[in-house]
Amino acid sequence: PDLSFLGDLQGLLISVAPTRRNEAYGDVFERGMRSLAAALRRRISTQPLHITYISSVSVYGDQRGEEVNESAALDTRSPVNSMLATAEELMLDIDRPDTSICVLRLGGIYGPGRDMVGMIREAAGQQVPKNGNAINAWSSLVDIARGVQFACDQRLSGVYNLVDDMQLSRRELSTLICDQEGLPPVLWNHTSSPTDRGMNARVSNQKIKDAGFQLVSPSMLQPVTA
């Protein structure tokens, strides 16, 4: 494909999520990311370029609920996590003095069109086949959009967790929501299934805050109008 247009860009947002677990898809995804990284490395341009690559905090895997930051080791046992980690590395390895690369790791997404609180209410009293003791990280759509703009404006380089402040297990979050509404609790499993990617960590967002970013949505329990 003709990727000569890359030389005209000043900013580039890459958001491609590997969603299939089979090996053939993994090869296609990795080959595509390698081709894009190679094209970015050899682009002909006289202007600087900032790249933002959207990844996921799921790459931390099961950390037994411990706090993790951007320097933590990644859990690549899952095929999807392995693809994400490889893509991050390919982007960060683009070695050009006129190119800055920022990886934003997102949590589960909520906001306009993704009413997670409403989904939890609908699950009240039902059995959900996921580990209720696992701690997830969350990202507001509003803060994702703001974070991408912030990364570009500030020419951020390296890896940043773009997640909100909430660090509750699935069970704690659903119980809090259901109790407020007088609903029966969601019935979760107590362990992860073999097919679960096993995210269980308190993901720190301190690095991006230290860079000057301010959340408008500290948690999904505090509604924000986009």
Q: Which residues does each predicted region cover?
A:
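Mid/C-terminal beta-alpha module of Rossmann-like enzyme folds, strongest
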Residues: 144-199
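SDR active-site strand-loop-helix element
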Residues: 15, 51-57, 104-106
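A short C-terminal helix-loop "cap" of Rossmann-like NAD(P)-dependent dehydrogenase/epimerase domains
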Residues: 120-130, 183-188
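C-terminal amphipathic/interface module of NAD(P)-dependent oxidoreductases
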Residues: 196-226
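Conserved Rossmann-fold NAD(P)-dependent oxidoreductase catalytic core, especially the SDR/UDP-sugar
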Residues: 37-79
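Substrate-positioning beta->alpha
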Residues: 109-119, 129-150
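NAD(P)-cofactor binding segment of oxidoreductase domains
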Residues: 7-52
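Catalytic helix-loop patch of NAD(P)-dependent Rossmann-fold dehydrogenases
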Residues: 64-103
